[in-house]
């Protein structure tokens, strides 16, 4: 046994074989091969040679005693229970599913369902901590080789979100792209129990409500519909938001009837109303072709019911453009 240990700790095998386990497996078996892999280390320095010789001498002197090989120590092989991890994950998702069912019948956050159905305003996103920023993602033309940069952080006193960066309309030098210059902030798609996609239902509201502070640039507000069809992933409903600039906050109210339908960045001739019962995400895009720094500070994003607004859809359709609406 001591001879085996000496072979495993020796520099000859480590020098000749990059994986001693593969070299010793036919002779010593799998348990000793695993042990050899746990002992594989660089060649000892001169300062450590004496301690190594001492260890080898002790083993040679006690060759008649059994050497206990601790191949299952907690440091080398941590105790990981996959069964427990699976049980904990399943229990978490079932608790989440239970909360969804209870909220659907009783009302979110313990409020009566009647009160929820009759509410006139609702804050969907607000920014009071880092966990609120994690619900959003930022992107720019840098993903296609552009030079625009965009960042997102908490504002002053952790009471708002600050979107800032630099816009550059210089096209990438790839021989294909001819236009560039955009920055965007997009909300992440919410997930329910068992990682199901969850959509927002705004069918009882008619207006988007924001409290923002900007630098005078125009932004595009984009709302996406929840869909499982790949062909519709580039479809969205958009409208403009104009910031005033200056140090003061402004309240922006955009009726949902004003949002126009577009696909792959092009406004379609055939227009559709925004399906308010299956909203997937909302985003803000800057692409005004004015190079330079920018910022947009957002306090909250919500929806409310404006009783003075009775318009259902702002855009005209005709039988030639959309015959399905006139059947």
From Swiss-Prot:
Bias-annotated ranges (Basic and acidic residues): 53-63
Any one GO cellular component localisation term in the record: mitochondrial matrix
Cross-referenced InterPro entries: Galactose-bd-like_sf, NADH-UbQ_OxRdtase-assoc_prot30, NDUFAF1
Coiled-coil ranges (or none): none
GO BP terms: mitochondrial electron transport, NADH to ubiquinone; mitochondrial respiratory chain complex I assembly
Main localization (coarse): mitochondrion
SUPFAM superfamilies according to UniProt: Galactose-binding domain-like
Residues that bear Phosphoserine: 318
Localization in the cell: Mitochondrion; Mitochondrion matrix
Molecular-function GO terms, alphabetical: unfolded protein binding
Region (Disordered): 42-63
Keyword Amino-acid biosynthesis applies: no
Keyword annotations: Chaperone, Mitochondrion, Phosphoprotein, Transit peptide
Domain of life: Eukaryota
Keyword Mitochondrion tagged: yes
Residue span of the annotated presequence: 1-24
Family: Belongs to the CIA30 family.
Biological role: As part of the MCIA complex, involved in the assembly of the mitochondrial complex I.
Assembly behavior: Part of the mitochondrial complex I assembly/MCIA complex that comprises at least the core subunits TMEM126B, NDUFAF1, ECSIT and ACAD9 and complement subunits such as COA1 and TMEM186. Interacts with ECSIT. Interacts with ACAD9. At early stages of complex I assembly, it is found in intermediate subcomplexes that contain different subunits including NDUFB6, NDUFA6, NDUFA9, NDUFS3, NDUFS7, ND1, ND2 and ND3. Interacts with TMEM70 and TMEM242.
PANTHER family referenced in this protein's UniProt entry, alphabetically: COMPLEX I INTERMEDIATE-ASSOCIATED PROTEIN 30, COMPLEX I INTERMEDIATE-ASSOCIATED PROTEIN 30, MITOCHONDRIAL
Name under which the protein is recorded: Complex I intermediate-associated protein 30, mitochondrial
Protein's organism: Pongo pygmaeus (Bornean orangutan)
């Amino acid at each position: 046994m001591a001879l085996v240990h000496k072979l495993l700790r020796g520099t000859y095998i480590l020098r000749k074989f990059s994986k001693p386990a593969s070299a010793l497996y036919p002779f010593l078996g799998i348990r000793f091969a695993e042990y050899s892999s746990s002992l594989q280390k660089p060649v000892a320095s001169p300062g450590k040679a004496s301690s190594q010789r001492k260890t080898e001498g002790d083993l040679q002197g006690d060759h008649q005693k059994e050497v206990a090989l601790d191949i299952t120590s907690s440091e080398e092989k941590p105790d990981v229970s996959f069964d427990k991890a699976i049980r904990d994950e399943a229990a978490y998702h079932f608790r989440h599913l239970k909360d969804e069912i209870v909220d659907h019948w009783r009302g979110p956050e313990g409020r009566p369902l009647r009160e929820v159905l009759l509410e006139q305003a609702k804050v969907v996103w607000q920014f009071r901590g880092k966990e609120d920023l994690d619900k959003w993602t930022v992107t720019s033309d840098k993903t296609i080789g552009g030079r625009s940069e965009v960042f997102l952080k908490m504002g002053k006193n952790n009471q708002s979100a600050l979107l800032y960066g630099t816009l550059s309309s210089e096209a990438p030098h790839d021989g294909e792209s001819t236009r560039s210059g955009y920055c965007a902030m997009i909300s992440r798609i919410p997930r329910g129990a068992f990682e199901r996609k969850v959509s927002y239902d705004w069918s009882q509201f008619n207006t988007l409500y924001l409290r923002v502070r900007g630098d005078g640039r125009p932004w595009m507000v984009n709302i996406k519909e929840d869909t499982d069809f790949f062909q519709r992933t580039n479809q969205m409903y958009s409208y403009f938001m104009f910031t005033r600039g200056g140090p003061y906050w402004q309240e922006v109210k955009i009726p949902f009837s004003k949002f126009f339908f577009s696909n792959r960045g092009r406004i379609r001739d055939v227009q559709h109303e925004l399906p308010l019962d299956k909203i997937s995400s909302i985003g803000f895009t800057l692409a005004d072709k004015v190079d330079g720094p920018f910022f947009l500070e957002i306090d909250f994003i919500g929806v409310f019911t404006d009783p003075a607004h009775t318009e259902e859809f702002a855009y005209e359709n005709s039988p030639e453009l959309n015959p399905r609406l006139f059947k």
